[in-house]
Structures are given as C-alpha cells and as structure tokens.
C-alpha cells in the first residue's frame, strides 16, 4: 500500500512494477494527497483502488469518512457491498435480497449531510490548494533566512503542502 503523505505523492513507478511482476493489486493511500499529482495524474488514481480521507485535519473535511475510487467494476461492487453490511449493491431494490448478507460488511455509509458538506468542500479545493501554496512560499521565504532550517525539495506543480 503506497502512501501519499503531507501533500506529496509517493514514487509509484517501482512499486507498481513490483506489484505487476507478482500479480498483486495495489491500494493507494491518498488520504494526504487530495489535489496532488504524480506526473500528470491525480494521486489516488494510479492503483487498483485509491482511498481518500475527509477527517477533520484534511484539506477537505466532512467531519469523518472518506472516498474510495477505482475503475475496476469488480472491486467497485465489492467495496459497495462492504460499506453496506455485506449486502449486494442492488439488494435495496429487491426485498428478498435486502436481508441477505453474502459477505461480511460494515456500516461505512456517508449521511446525506456529510455528502452535501463534501460536495460544497470540493468546490473550494482549488482555492484551498492555491492558498496552501502561497502559505508555503511565505514560510519558505521567511524561514530560509535561518541557517538551522532546511526545506524538502518541493515542486508546487505536483505538491500541495499541508
């Protein structure tokens, strides 16, 4: 599980090659990477599954919860069942299936309120990214005058500092 941390993308190339050699799936932990890029791709979209956190200290918050992204229909169906007590995704429309739980699952559903907050927050993502980058530049300018302070190399076209 590669982890994007503090607004910086993990170097996914070698990890992906190793996973492919051993026929392994990868889950990218992009909890700290929303809005960041690896090359020209958004972090969280480079593996079989990408996960994002919307907990309180993140760039977008719904209080708690998060988001899973995938372009694999089978994994999508599995995630959908896991978040709804193990029910099949179409179980709510079929009363006979509504009480069947073919797999172990959990209650990981967002409330409508959390979803509304998340949508409103997403609309502010670009502005927040710009603000974070401005703050980084200010801190770097002021703190770089101190000989005891060093900065990690940061490409602001790829990184959104937290």
Task: Please identify what each model-predicted range represents.
Residues 1-62, 67-74:
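Active-site phosphate-binding strand-loop segment of PLP-dependent enzymes
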Residues 1-3, 8-14, 21, 37, ...:
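PLP-dependent aminotransferase class I/II
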């Amino acid at each position: 599980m590669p982890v994007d941390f503090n607004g910086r993308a993990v170097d996914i190339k070698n990890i992906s090659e190793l996973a492919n050699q051993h026929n392994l799936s990868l889950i990218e932990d992009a909890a700290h990477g929303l809005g960041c890029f690896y090359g020209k791709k958004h972090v969280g979209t480079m593996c079989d599954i990408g996960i994002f956190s919307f907990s309180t200290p993140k760039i977008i918050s719904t209080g708690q919860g998060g988001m899973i992204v995938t372009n694999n229909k089978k994994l999508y169906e599995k995630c959908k069942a896991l978040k709804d007590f193990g029910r099949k995704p179409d179980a709510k429309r079929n009363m006979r299936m509504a009480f069947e739980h073919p797999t172990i699952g959990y209650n990981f559903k967002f409330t409508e309120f959390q979803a509304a907050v998340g949508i409103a927050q997403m609309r502010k993502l670009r502005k927040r990214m710009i603000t974070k980058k401005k703050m980084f530049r200010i801190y770097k300018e002021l703190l770089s005058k101190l000989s005891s302070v060093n900065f990690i190399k940061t490409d602001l076209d790829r990184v959104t500092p937290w």
